[in-house]
Amino acid sequence: MALREIIILPDKRLREISKPVAEVTPEIRKLADDMFESMYDAPGIGLAAIQIAEPVRLITMDIVRKEGNGKSDPRAFINPEIVGASAEMNVYEEGCLSIPEYYADVERPAVVRIRYTDLDGNVKEEDADGLFATCIQHEIDHLDGVLFVDHLSKLKRAMVVRKFEKAAKRGIKYV
């Protein structure tokens, strides 16, 4: 495993649309391992491969760790897609490792049905709700070049982007 640098807004690579993974290879498994290590180090509960400058449709998540009970449930999702969503919506305060120290309420479907491939090459479908639903939607957005701030008003989004552009010009590094 290797710790990888997480790219930060305004890095243009965050807007790239990630390419599908053709097959689960040892390289994809190694990338997932690197992503888990980088995600835990940050610390975070979800990471899309594009956030470490790898434009492939791979997500790692461990929402159990957020609860701080010492437990862990690391999961990897290859080529994840939302195949159904509830009409009911939830609002959750979101943050992002690529937009450090900024949090905002985002409204998303309360329940989504996802289809993905696991690290063993098995295609699976399952329903996600609560934090799992919010996190998987947030990470799938990354794979499509969408950031959580894109769900905010135009004014709020512009303020956040401007803040990070100024920080980048000044050479401010978020750690």
UniProtKB/Swiss-Prot annotation:
Cofactor annotation: Fe(2+)
GO MF: metal ion binding; peptide deformylase activity
A Pfam cross-reference name: Pep_deformylase
EC nos: 3.5.1.88
Reactions the enzyme catalyzes: N-terminal N-formyl-L-methionyl-[peptide] + H2O = N-terminal L-methionyl-[peptide] + formate
Catalytic machinery residues: E139
Record's keyword terms, sorted: Hydrolase, Iron, Metal-binding, Protein biosynthesis
An example Gene Ontology biological process: translation
Annotated positions binding Fe cation: C96, H138, H142
Alphabetical list of InterPro entries matching this protein: Peptide_deformylase, Peptide_deformylase_sf
The keyword Oxidoreductase is assigned to this record: no
Cofactor binding comment, as recorded: Binds 1 Fe(2+) ion.
Summary of the function given for this chain in its UniProt record: Removes the formyl group from the N-terminal Met of newly synthesized proteins. Requires at least a dipeptide for an efficient rate of reaction. N-terminal L-methionine is a prerequisite for activity but the enzyme has broad specificity at other positions.
Family the entry assigns: Belongs to the polypeptide deformylase family.
Name of the protein this chain belongs to: Peptide deformylase
Source organism of this protein record: Rhodopseudomonas palustris (strain BisB5)
Lineage: Bacteria, Pseudomonadati, Pseudomonadota, Alphaproteobacteria, Hyphomicrobiales
